[in-house]
Amino acid sequence: MTARILDGSKIRDQIFAELKDEVRLLTSAGVRPGLAAVLVGENPASQLYVKSKIAACEEIGLSSALLTPPATASTLELLAVIEDLNRDNDVDGILVQLPLPPQVDTKRILEAVDPAKDVDGFHPVNLGRLVSGRPGLVACTPAGCMEILRRNEIPIEGANAVVLGRSDIVGKPMALLLMHANATVTICHSKTRDLPEVLRRADIIVAAMGKAGFVQPDWIKPATASKPGAAVIDVGTNRITDSQEAEHLFQNFPERLEKFRAKGSALVGDVHPDAIRSAGALTPVPGGVGPMTITMLMSNTVKAARLRRASPKFSATQSTASAR
């Protein structure tokens, strides 16, 4: 059987339509949500990412501002930029594009952002809110994964869910979100024993390890005539350039192999492409989780605008680094 494809681009379009309506309502009430992006230096990849985020703001009607400190900016200079944005009532969300230059203390910069404006969901205060189940801003990629599951009506409550990876940005918040949705959650990592057996029991797999084609098809609960098989959310985005690796991964996908040979590289997830023949449902790479990250950034910006105005305490919360 062939897995059902969980198309992130379609869900992106659905959510963008909903956000446009909400932004119109807020704007008519005198509140136009706004996002400020801080791009340090002239890294081409970072410039491209920020450009796509600004374009998304324009698409749904958010105001946006781009601040471009030089690549030589110091930690103290960037802290001053963040402080100004924290105080600006027209700014609901602050995005610091990573990576920052090596002379900058990245952790200190991220923790200086007002948690109420932390639309990336990286701040320890927002992670703490997630742990306790309180309203807050959730890291964009895990939030996007949850939207994929819910909007495709994948059963979560009571499901055995396995999260591969334990990063602060994806793995840990993903596990918490699944737990709050009443799944039974297992977090796996490089020290996990008998990983294939753990995965074979999973109804939901979220792969976020950063290893191309790591999860093998026979590690995934297969779909049968009476059971749906595992739903696989592939967060990995790995660019491969080795021809032998490509031939191994794409041996059953001649079109993808031809594209690799023509381009010299390809994007693959953490799940082997052959999993499409074993899983019950699967996010493609590219086109699955990827479109959802910017989508949830936009959603968080609108959410921040609501929360800041509805809850003065939430808006007033400042990080220790920011207070210094």
Residue ranges and their predicted role:
Residues V96-Q103, K211-G213, T237-I240, G288-V289:
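Short glycine-rich anion-binding loops that position phosphate/pyrophosphate groups of nucleotides
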Residues L35, C57-A71, V185-I187:
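Short beta-strand elements in bilobed, periplasmic/extracellular small-molecule ligand-binding domains
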Residues D90-V91, A202:
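Short, high-confidence coil segments that cap the C-terminus of an alpha-helix
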Residues V40-A55, G136-Q251, K263-P273:
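Glycine-rich phosphate/diphosphate-binding loop of Rossmann-like nucleotide-binding domains
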Residues M1-I11, V104-R108:
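Helix-enriched interaction subdomains in cytosolic or periplasmic regions
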Residues T2, S9, I15-D21, L25, ...:
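Adenosine-phosphate binding glycine-rich loop
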